[in-house]
């Protein structure tokens, strides 16, 4: 697939993975979740990724989620899927994504160990193998790339972009500038994404660095707010962005930062507050306390009040 065929415009959604009371995947609930994202206007779906609790899922569960998402989407939006972890698992995941007709793969970092820069490129190359499914490399955690190393990813034909979850704008600016400066069609087409938790908080800074695309966890429970912010960013509407940041996103981040893992747990809790059947999180993530859920409800309520006043 030529890189110019990659369609990842608009707001990128990362569906939650619903679980039953005994923490088995709930495919019926997942189908409803996928449909709600599409109906709300998601530009693409990334299933079984960070927000979808990839680290807690088995290979068979990821395959089942991909198949269900493709069935529900029925070609209306692109469906990407997560892969990663240990080298063998990452390779198997990419191969399974291609076999399952995924539109692409978000390749998560190596599991547990941190290798040198050349080792990171080798990890991506090994994971990709002889597949041709498009791959976006997640730059975070045990997989943080320098700009020269990131440029080497362009030697792997199916790698079409980098998603930043590391959070260093200077590093990402170096990566974007280094790749664009190569002056080839390949480097001009290469895609960059802001993949930080609650990416709206850093969206203006990243857009200024040439990274306007981002994923929105808020789309899981308040797509109306997520789309209004996304439109404001595209229109350079600082007043709207600042109002939503002050009245909703920053209070949400303050609550999120109270407990490790709340970048996922709070999203699931907020989705439940809005009536979605997503269940709880798998360990080692934990659920918010009743007091935190009460505060979460007030944050979401205030967010919609701000939205109404715009």
Question: Positions of the model-derived regions?
Answer:
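A general structural signal for well-ordered alpha-helical segments in protein cores
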Residues: 62, 66, 90, 172, ...
């Amino acid at each position: 697939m030529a890189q110019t065929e990659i369609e990842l415009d608009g707001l990128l959604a990362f569906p939650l993975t619903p679980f039953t009371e005994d923490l088995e995947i709930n495919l019926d609930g997942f189908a409803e979740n996928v449909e709600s994202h599409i109906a709300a206007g998601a530009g693409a779906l990334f299933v079984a990724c960070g927000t979808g609790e990839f680290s807690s899922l088995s290979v068979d569960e990821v395959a089942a989620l991909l198949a269900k998402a493709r069935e529900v989407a029925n070609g209306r939006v692109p469906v990407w899927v997560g892969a990663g972890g240990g080298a063998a698992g990452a390779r198997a995941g990419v191969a399974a994504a291609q076999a399952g007709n995924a539109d692409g793969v978000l390749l998560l970092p190596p599991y547990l160990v941190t290798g040198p820069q050349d080792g990171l490129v080798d990890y991506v190359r090994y994971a990709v193998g002889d597949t041709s499914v498009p791959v976006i490399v997640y730059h975070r955690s045990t997989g943080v790339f320098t700009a020269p190393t990131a440029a080497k990813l362009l030697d792997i034909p199916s790698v079409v972009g980098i998603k930043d979850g590391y959070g260093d704008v200077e590093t990402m600016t170096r990566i974007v500038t280094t790749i664009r400066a190569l002056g080839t069609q390949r480097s001009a087409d290469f895609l960059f994404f802001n993949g930080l938790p609650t990416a709206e908080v850093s969206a203006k800074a990243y857009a200024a660095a040439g990274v306007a695309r981002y994923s929105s966890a808020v789309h899981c429970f308040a797509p109306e707010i997520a789309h209004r912010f996304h439109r404001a960013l595209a229109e350079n509407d600082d007043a709207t962005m600042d109002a939503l940041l002050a009245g909703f996103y920053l209070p949400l981040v303050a609550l999120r930062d109270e407990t490790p893992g709340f970048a996922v747990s709070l999203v699931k809790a907020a989705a439940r507050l809005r009536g979605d059947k997503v269940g709880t999180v798998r360990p080692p993530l934990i659920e918010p306390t009743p007091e935190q859920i009460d505060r979460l409800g007030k944050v979401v309520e205030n967010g919609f009040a701000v939205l109404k006043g715009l």
